[in-house]
């Protein structure tokens, strides 16, 4: 059974290492190593993760058989729940971990009297887009978000209505 547990501040280095492993493996082929390195340095370093925590994002581990196999982060934004990150180590995918996380997120969203969950997904992240579609998310728009130094995120915004 998958356990979900809040990431403690003292675990940020461990979180950064797992994030780097998963994100490097998954996104290098999609967005290229150079762009991915920039994004990792911006969002997945201990400093970047701490800043996101300070900005109100809640980070939780996904733990399977006492092994930290992934994590996710979310926060209320614009009257909806924003799922910022959901990453699972590739050797643990297909074990219903994402479904467990999604169920938790739905309950949390309801408990905060919100009726929608939204997220951003890279337009070329086909497998992830298919998973979110299977869960019931719909594409509501495309957007390009500059992140500095000539880099940008080319995403779809997906939304799920409870």
Where do the language-model regions lie?
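Helix-turn-helix
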Residues: 128
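Residues forming the Rossmann-fold NAD(P)(H) cofactor-binding site
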Residues: 99
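Extreme N-terminal starter segment of soluble prokaryotic enzymes
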Residues: 1-4
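Conserved active-site tyrosine of GNAT-family acetyltransferases
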Residues: 132, 137
